[in-house]
């Protein structure tokens, strides 16, 4: 196809609904010859940094754009697992309420931990059902996956790259999906979470 003047551009896109409205992060790869043709359009529609730089640049040949997007998603798997473990520690270890945990996450979002995931997690903890019970306590405790975290972990294994955080996050999702097995195991090995002696403010 290249000999015929037809060039391939494989582009990872990230941003969800907010990205669709206000501009996504764009990760183009493929035929270098095509970059100058698509650059003006891609960088015009991409999200911008605080200093106006577009969140879009050429990342490499062939499938590099989608590879970067895959790794980006893998990193998010790790981030979400850390959020889950922080929530469980606060709830079961420190005995904090959903409102208290919301306050912590909202404060974190004003620091170097500021991120989209921290922001929406804080909002989730604040959301109440019609009966006033925090919605987070009613959500089914299972998690699915689309495969990008698994692909990232497999690539890390294939290349001998230590990536334990993301790999463990993938396994945590596998475990979360096994709801019947977890319920059965709990009946045999029921253990009450131990409280932690600690300062909630810390």
Regions found by a protein language model. Give the residues of each.
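C-terminal catalytic subdomain
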Residues: 201-202
């Amino acid at each position: 196809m290249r000999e015929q003047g037809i060039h391939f551009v494989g582009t990872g896109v990230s941003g969800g609904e907010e990205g669709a409205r206000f501009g996504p992060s764009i990760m183009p790869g493929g035929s270098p010859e095509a970059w100058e043709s698509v650059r003006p359009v891609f960088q015009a529609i991409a999200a911008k940094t605080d200093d106006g730089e577009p969140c879009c640049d050429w990342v490499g040949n062939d499938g590099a754009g989608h590879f970067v997007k895959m790794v980006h998603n893998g990193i998010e798997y790790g981030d979400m697992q850390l959020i889950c473990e922080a929530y469980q520690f606060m709830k079961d270890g420190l005995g904090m309420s959903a409102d208290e945990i919301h306050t912590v996450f909202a404060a974190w979002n004003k620091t170097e931990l500021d991120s989209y995931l921290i922001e929406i997690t804080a909002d989730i903890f604040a959301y109440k059902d019609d009966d006033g019970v925090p919605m987070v306590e009613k959500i089914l405790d299972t998690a699915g996956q689309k495969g990008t975290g698994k692909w990232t972990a497999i690539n890390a294994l294939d290349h001998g790259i230590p990536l334990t955080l993301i790999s463990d996050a993938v396994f945590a999702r596998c475990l979360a999906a096994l709801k019947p097995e977890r319920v059965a195991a709990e009946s045999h090995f029921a253990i009450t979470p131990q409280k932690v002696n600690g300062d909630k403010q810390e």
